[in-house]
Swiss-Prot record:
It comes from Dictyostelium discoideum. The keyword Metal-binding applies. This is Selenide, water dikinase. Binds 1 Mg(2+) ion per monomer. Homodimer.
Length: 364
């Protein structure tokens, strides 16, 4: 699939990010707070998707929903990113095809009528175009008024019980694969500092506008990129479990995935692929986003997949051949059978992890 930043014949009528304080998946309720809210409800945070039995034998409905506030100013790309983000939960189950999508949209009451019409129409177009790219369709949804713009949706697949990968079967000896670099939320925040002189002055000695625009364009394309190829290759290479990395960061989502496993295991993350320049900016400001701690939010991030090392190496090779974007082996699945207590399943980032600075490659 080809993705490109749209050529603009005219300036943006407004900046979407001027109408919200929280941005992208950074709007999620913190993981610890969410766990307390869900106490006594179902299985807590649980899986990325709901699994519902239908009235037909061996047929299930897999469903997910997600929405957020704008994190880029271009409404068309905001729609594409939102759609890709919704679909990623299905893709983390190894489900390549989404049967139906609904769109959730809030039009900003803080905008002028012209700005609201312009931005809402382009967000809808971007979301719908991305759904079509994914081989799906938008059949309905809900549109409301709200001070902050919102875009997201619902994704549904109907399939047989043996046609998806339940995220519970990681085994000791597996490795962890990540299909997109970290640092999207950090990159978006730094890019917005370009228009805020008092903040830009804090980092203009170690970066420049050209560098900032380059990595921001890369982050935008990365967030808009579908994880669909990864989902297909998960099946081909016998993945045992997966999640997508979004608002809880790499550590939060890997911990949740570890806690869903049937065996007593621990995930150890030894490598962090990070969009180039994000580490130096984090270091310069004394780590305000906690990117190296693994708790920085990501928006429409990559798949984190547990599979055998041999299959992981083949997976990384093939996904690069298809998409011209790298994937990385970033961790190991460690046996914790001596504990005999699955409730202690967890994920950690090892001390002084290897940092891979990922070059901005916009060849999507």
């Amino acid at each position: 699939m080809s993705i490109s930043i749209k050529d603009k014949k005219e300036e943006l009528l407004c900046r979407l990010t001027d109408f919200t304080k929280l941005k992208g998946u950074g709007c999620k309720v913190p993981q610890a707070e969410l766990l307390s809210l869900l106490d006594g409800i179902g299985e807590g945070i649980g899986y990325d998707c709901s699994i519902s039995q239908t009235k037909f034998p061996d047929i299930v409905m897999i469903q997910t929903t997600d929405f957020f506030f704008p994190l880029v100013d271009d409404p068309y790309f905001q729609g594409k990113i939102a759609c890709a983000n919704v679909l990623s939960d299905l893709y983390s189950f190894g489900i390549e095809d989404c049967d139906n999508m609904l769109m959730l949209l809030a039009c900003s009451t803080d905008m002028t009528a012209e700005q609201r019409q312009w931005s809402s129409k382009l967000m809808i177009q971007g979301f719908n175009d991305q759904a079509i790219c994914a081989g799906s369709k938008v059949s309905g949804g809900q549109t409301v008024k709200n001070p902050w713009p919102i875009v997201g949706g619902v994704a549904t697949s109907i399939l047989k019980t043996n046609e998806f990968i339940k995220p519970v079967n990681a085994v000791p000896g597996d490795v962890l694969v990540l299909t997109k670099p970290l640092g999207t939320q950090v990159c978006v925040n730094f890019h917005q500092w370009l228009s805020k002189p008092e903040r830009w002055e804090k980092i203009n000695t170690i970066t420049n506008a050209e560098e900032c625009e380059q990595v921001f364009n890369y982050a935008t394309l990365s967030m808009a990129r579908l994880n669909r190829v990864g989902a297909r290759l998960m099946k081909k290479y016998n993945a045992h479990a997966a999640t997508d990395v979004t608002g809880f960061g790499i550590l939060g989502h890997s911990t949740n995935l570890a806690q869903n496993q049937l065996l007593p295991i621990r995930f150890e993350i030894h490598t962090l692929p990070i969009i180039k320049h994000m580490k130096k900016l984090e270091d310069h400001l004394n780590h305000p986003f906690k990117l190296l701690k693994g708790t920085s939010a990501e928006t429409s991030g990559g798949l984190l997949i547990s599979m055998s090392r041999e299959n992981a190496e083949a997976f990384c090779k093939e996904i690069y051949e298809i998409e011209k974007q790298p994937a990385w082996i970033i961790g190991d699945v460690i046996d914790q059978s001596s504990n005999y207590d699955r409730s202690k399943n967890t994920s950690i980032i090892l001390e002084n992890p290897k940092i891979i600075e990922v070059e901005p490659n916009t060849n999507f």
